[in-house]
Amino acid sequence: MNNARRVALDFETIVNAFDVMGRYLRDQCGVVGEIAVYGGTAMLLQFPWRKMTEDVDVTILTGERESAVKDAAAFAAVRLGLPDDWLNNYVGGFTPETESQAFFSTFGVYPRGEAPGLRVFLAKPEYLCAMKLKALERESVDDRDFEDAVNLALEIGIDTVDHLKQLFTSFFPGETLHSSALARLPELAEKIQLRRPG
């Protein structure tokens, strides 16, 4: 089993894995699967400042094809020497009860340049930032969630506590940020303002 070791995944490794998955879904299953990508991978695939991630957090959008998508991910793990859980659906605790298609952008179809077997959608930067605000309630390695929130806020152009709260509420209506996350918003806004260009 290759579960025990962690591998740093970069852009090329991830899109190569999507190619393998797409070919498998098309050729072995005769279907087109769809996944929505979140977290570090969604940032890595959209921005040059995120270079690596440990895994690919997804939801499988084609529920009737869930087992085929999981089989394709397992096949890609074996083919490319990736950990068994390189693609996982552990993201549920940080998503709202209902997600709109407007929260996502189309990233691509795989395999690249061939008949498709996999469609990949990415969480938009605004949605990722709201999710990172929610994640501030927990501690993360090297305070990664905080740093990601700073970078995402810079990308979308918000830099005040009020704007951060409004952003969170727009994606998580009816929810309030945990007190530990709320307590970090002034520090977050200050860091965003310090790093803002110009």
Locate predicted features:
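Compositionally biased terminal segments of proteins
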Residues: M1-G198
